[in-house]
Swiss-Prot record:
Keywords: Ribonucleoprotein, Ribosomal protein. It comes from Borrelia hermsii (strain HS1 / DAH). Pfam families: Ribosomal_L35p. This is Large ribosomal subunit protein bL35. GO terms for biological process: translation. GO terms for cellular component: cytosolic large ribosomal subunit. Belongs to the bacterial ribosomal protein bL35 family. The gene is rpmI.
Length: 65
């Protein structure tokens, strides 16, 4: 049987913590920032954690992570 392939787009977007949770960088912080409040920009700057149901799906996309 051939090796499982890593989904390259998922590899760029997600990272695993030491506890096995999946973290990601939030979107909407690249441009058109003037209309976004400073509170919103500050919250977007922090990384987010993926829910447990989505974590299972991401682990199938990243078999060797």
């Amino acid at each position: 049987m051939s090796k499982m392939k890593t989904c390259k787009s998922a590899r760029k977007r997600y990272a695993f913590t030491s506890k096995g949770k999946v973290k990601y960088k939030k979107q909407n912080l690249r441009h058109i920032l003037t209309k976004k409040s400073s509170k919103r920009r500050r919250k977007l700057g922090k990384s987010g954690l993926v829910s447990s149901s989505e974590t299972k799906r991401i682990k199938t996309l990243l078999p060797y992570a």
